[in-house]
UniProtKB/Swiss-Prot annotation:
Keywords: Cytoplasm, Cytoskeleton, Metal-binding, Nucleus, Repeat, Zinc, Zinc-finger. It comes from the Eukaryota. GO terms for biological process: DNA-templated transcription; negative regulation of transcription by RNA polymerase II; positive regulation of transcription by RNA polymerase II; regulation of fungal-type cell wall organization; regulation of transcription by RNA polymerase II. Required for maintaining cell viability in nitrogen-deficient stationary phase (G0) cells. Its main location: nucleus. The lineage of its organism: Eukaryota, Fungi, Dikarya, Ascomycota, Taphrinomycotina. It comes from Schizosaccharomyces pombe (strain 972 / ATCC 24843) (Fission yeast). The gene is klf1. This is Zinc finger protein klf1. GO terms for cellular component: chromatin; cytoplasm; mitotic spindle; nucleolus; nucleus.
Length: 781
């Protein structure tokens, strides 16, 4: 037996191969190792497995993965089809799978166009942007309009036959150059086998091409002016001050009652919303066997209280996160885990301390129950994702610090599960049975549409939650924005339809535009976007904040790549993002505020505007570092203080601090300005209290670091509310007029701290309780 050759250890004087990436100092003894390391900088995982969406930097690794994980398993007879019903792209003429209701001519044209891109990976030494990138992306967007599982005709009101693709869906065009896509000609007619799983995050061909985030960002900016805009004169016209709402033209008032048709805020339950006695008995038995609840807690959970908590879910939570379809959901038939997620969320909003403690106890077991359920096995059922999303929002935004931290850990599990797609066995996607006629066909088509729209809403609201927690808590986003290349949500009145007849009457509404072109329009600021619903506007805002996070990443050279390839000046990319945020606010005013469609004090409006202000703040401030600095002050931790004080001092000396301070003043004034009283216990926007806390820290840090103190505006005056209003007025005047008035009052933040402590102290959310404790210690300094 021949002995294996023993490799010689590295010796001094041997050749070292250095990484060519700018700023990297690593070197390697072998050239291939240096090349492999270089790809980690460019994130060039251009080879995508069509079976499981795994990505690789080398084609040989992809081929080995496919042979070991998919081909051999298929040859052994373990599966008749690949796990996700996707076909390996090779040199042969194999076809990418499309839903059976998509015309074959569309499939062939889209496949031919995309295959030419997929087979050519983007290498590190090649330009990020190819000459035909924009054309290819637009073609991919056009393809998703046809091939996406959730897209269906709203103009075809017939109740028989198969679903057809309307002509307008084949060409997404809203009379704007940023939304135009090429049309696709018809050539053939074929039928494909039904899928075993349904994609949640877009379709396979689109994701296979649009897998590179850097390329996507380049596409967003490729039509911009070559010279970046300059910073505008400092003022408060981009804030949420009600006095500024007359800056935009007023549109005609809506002809329908927008609030009643789009926001179902009533807590009146119909029969299907009520838990029957038999279902209630089964629920109590499951809770007694699987959830560690005391006898007192089980006795407290009466049937009438359960129905009350369900009502609060629909009244307080659903209008903000409408991903459950109330018209078709029957609580008696809902899985226990989904029902418990709804009930516990209602327990939070009902305002009862004992009910809230029971909800926290239930969530210590609920997630485990979902993970061990047979329906969680990939591809999971739709209700699994719905229950997990409700659970994550409860645990992150209302529960204890421990559950908050665990929820962030399990967030990745949920997203990874979603990548595997949605099980088709629990969704109405199959063809209409031959023996089905009349009313049954109508109901079938309605439920079919509901399943598709519900799946799309899970994708978008998961993206919103993921993006929201980036700016709230500084977490790293786990959902790549390129994976939500989907048409936006349907009109909420259509989603709220509680019968097939009501749904049919609204089907002639316009189809929603695609997310990516709309996002690009807000970044270019050149054209007024199409009329969007409040929920779609919220999705766009979170898309903009995600782009800001991508551009702020270090050592990846994204901005340099964009400038090199299309000549756009992005050195001041923060100015571009700020301009897009302001354009979003102006558009929001035109759509909803100036015409009275939504009142300024509407809870949903207040939640969106708080997110807008925090988006500006997070663009210019490391919120986590600021929180850590405040914690180091009250804990006297030298290590924490040393690591954050340098950042805070540098931040204070930069222009970033002034921008953040302005928006913090806006935020506090929106909560506590004038005679306003804030009730945190009745707050339905779960993120808003945290926005107030962050804004308070920013204003405190500005005064404390500058002057070394925190004091009352008028010593001897114990009316904190009046002193707070005087402080806000002088800060606003001084900052907007570039005067020095605010320098005198900048350290007069003691009334602010006391007022914020008073309004936030009733909160039960563990993270906010810790924040109030820090503010209380800052008062005592």
């Amino acid at each position: 037996m021949t002995k294996a050759k023993k490799s010689r250890a590295y010796q001094e004087g041997d050749i070292r191969y250095k990484c060519d990436f700018q700023g990297c100092t690593k070197s390697f003894t072998r050239k291939e190792h240096a090349r492999r390391h270089f790809r980690s900088h460019t994130n060039s995982k251009a080879f995508i497995c069509p079976h499981c969406s795994s990505s690789f930097t080398r084609s040989d690794v992809l081929n080995r993965h496919v042979n070991q994980k998919h081909v051999k398993q298929n040859d052994a007879g373990s599966q008749t089809h690949p796990k996700h019903d996707k076909t390996l792209i090779s040199s042969s003429d194999q076809e990418l799978p499309f839903p059976s209701y998509v015309e074959a001519d569309v499939q062939d044209a889209a496949y031919t166009d995309l295959k030419s891109h997929i087979d050519q990976p983007i290498l590190p030494d090649q330009p990020i942007i190819s000459d035909n990138f924009n054309e290819g992306l637009q073609s991919a967007i056009a393809q998703t309009g046809n091939n996406y599982m959730f897209t269906t005709s709203r103009r075809n009101n017939s109740i028989s036959g198969s679903i057809t693709i309307p002509e307008s869906d084949q060409q997404i065009n809203l009379q704007n150059k940023f939304l135009s896509t090429p049309s696709i000609k018809n050539n053939a007619n074929k039928s494909l086998s039904p899928q075993d799983s349904i994609s949640i995050f877009g379709t396979s061909p689109f994701n296979a091409y649009q897998q590179n985030t850097d390329n996507f960002v380049c596409w967003l900016f490729d039509n911009m002016e070559k010279d970046a805009p300059t910073e505008s004169v400092s003022n408060f016209t981009d804030g949420i001050n009600a006095k500024q709402l007359n800056l935009m033209p007023v549109l005609d008032s809506p002809t329908i009652d927008f609030l009643s048709s789009h926001f179902r805020v009533d807590d009146k339950l119909v029969a299907k919303d009520l838990l029957s006695l038999s279902a209630y008995s089964s629920l109590i038995q499951v809770m007694n066997n699987n959830y560690q609840l005391s006898e007192e807690a089980l006795q407290y959970i009466t049937r009438s209280r359960v129905n009350l908590w369900i009502a609060h879910y629909w009244k307080d939570f659903h209008p903000r996160w409408p991903f459950l379809h109330r018209g078709t959901l029957k609580v008696d038939e809902a899985p226990v885990e989904l029902l418990l997620a709804m009930i516990t969320m209602g327990m939070h909003f009902v305002g009862d301390a004992f009910a809230y403690s029971i909800a926290v106890s239930i969530h210590s077991t609920l997630r485990f129950s979902i993970y061990t359920h047979p329906d969680f096995k990939p591809p999971a059922s739709l209700w699994v994702y719905q229950a997990l999303l409700i659970a994550e929002i409860f645990e992150k935004m209302t529960s204890t610090v421990e559950q908050h931290n665990l929820s962030q850990i399990f967030h990745g599990v949920t997203i990874e599960s979603m990548q595997n797609g949605l099980s088709s066995k629990d969704t109405v996607t199959e063809k209409i049975p031959k023996n089905m006629t009349g009313t049954n066909i109508a109901q079938h088509k309605w439920h079919q549409w509901v399943d598709r729209e519900a799946s799309k809403r899970i994708a978008f609201f998961s993206f919103v939650l993921d993006s929201q927690h980036v700016i709230l808590f500084g977490y790293r986003p786990l959902i790549d924005i390129t994976s939500v290349g989907l048409p936006l949500l349907c009109d909420e009145a259509l989603w709220n339809a509680d019968s097939y007849e009501a749904w049919t009457s609204l089907l002639n509404e316009n189809d929603p535009p695609h997310f990516f072109p709309v996002l690009k329009m807000f970044l270019t600021n050149e054209h007024l976007p199409p009329k969007l619903s409040p929920w779609n506007m919220m999705i766009v805002l979170h898309g903009l904040t995600t782009i800001g996070w991508i551009l702020s990443r270090e050592n990846l050279g994204i901005v340099e790549n964009i400038m090199q390839n299309n000549g756009t000046n992005l050195k001041n990319w923060r100015i571009l993002l700020k301009a897009s945020y302001k354009f979003w606010l102006r558009t929001y005013r035109v759509f909803f505020l100036n015409n009275g469609t939504l009142p300024l004090n509407h809870p949903y409006v207040r939640g969106c505007l708080a997110t807008y202000e925090l988006a500006h703040i997070s663009l210019h401030t490391n919120i986590v570092a600021l929180q850590t600095y405040a914690k180091s002050i009250v804990s006297t931790s030298r290590r924490l203080y040393a690591s954050t004080s340098r950042y805070v001092s540098a931040w204070l000396a930069s222009d970033d601090s002034e921008v953040s301070i302005k928006h913090a003043v806006d935020m506090v004034e929106a909560f506590l300005g004038g005679d306003m009283e804030y009730d945190v216990q009745n707050e339905t926007g779960l993120h808003r209290p945290w926005c107030l806390y962050v804004s308070t820290l920013i204003l405190w840090a500005y005064g404390y670091v500058s002057d070394g103190r925190c004091e009352m505006l008028e010593p001897g005056n114990n009316d904190c509310k009046s002193q707070l209003n005087a402080y806000l007025m002088q800060m606003r005047t001084g900052l907007s007029e570039k005067a020095k008035d605010h320098v005198y009052v900048r350290s007069k933040t003691l009334p602010l701290l006391k007022c914020v402590i008073d309004v936030l102290c009733p909160a039960r959310w563990g993270l906010l309780v810790d924040g109030v404790r820090i503010l209380s210690k800052l008062v005592q300094l």
